[in-house]
């Protein structure tokens, strides 16, 4: 899932979801029903142009489109970018739920506190080099991480 959502703004919500699916129509219908169950707001707006959705709804659409391909893993690049604090919490709850359903999430995120709070394992990069790695909860409590990335 690329940074900045990258939806197709002139297409409807439903058309955007179809872009992420395989071509088997029956399978696509089942997967779309699953996405709509996870994101009821998208179902309410399925005929609406994607470019008119709020930032949070566009992020939900980007996640939904990624899920349409029934992936084993999703790379998410800055999913909280440009969202209000309330929507950030909502998106991170969605990421956690997707992961609980067996999909591996590789999360690239500057909001270290939120990312560490929902992660199992974490890596800290500085100028492209891994400087720390380990259990996310341990890193969340690490004094070096707190000082450098969590403002504590």
Residue ranges of predicted features:
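Hydrophobic anchor residue at the start of the ABC signature
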Residues: 19, 63
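A short, proline-enriched helix->beta-strand linker immediately N-terminal to the Walker B motif
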Residues: 68-72, 78
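Short, glycine/charged-rich "phosphate-handling" switch motifs in NTP-dependent
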Residues: 121, 133
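Helical segment within the ABC ATPase nucleotide-binding domain
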Residues: 89-101
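ABC ATPase signature
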Residues: 11, 53, 66-67
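Short coil-to-helix segment of the ABC ATPase nucleotide-binding domain corresponding to the Q-loop/switch region
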Residues: 9-18
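Conserved ABC ATPase signature
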Residues: 49-53, 57
């Amino acid at each position: 899932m690329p940074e900045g959502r990258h939806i197709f703004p002139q297409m409807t919500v439903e058309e955007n979801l179809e872009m992420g699916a395989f071509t088997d129509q029956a399978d696509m219908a089942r997967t779309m029903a699953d996405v709509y169950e996870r994101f009821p707001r998208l179902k309410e707006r399925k005929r609406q142009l994607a470019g008119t959705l709020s930032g949070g709804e566009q992020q939900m659409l980007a996640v939904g489109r990624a899920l349409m391909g029934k992936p084993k893993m999703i790379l998410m690049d800055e999913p909280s970018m440009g969202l209000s604090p309330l929507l950030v919490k909502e998106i991170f709850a969605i990421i956690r739920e997707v992961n609980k359903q067996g999909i591996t999430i590789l999360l690239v995120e500057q909001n270290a506190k939120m990312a560490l709070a929902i992660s199992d394992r974490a890596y800290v990069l500085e100028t492209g080099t891994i400087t720390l790695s380990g259990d996310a909860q341990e890193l969340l409590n690490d004094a070096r991480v707190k000082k450098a990335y969590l403002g504590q």
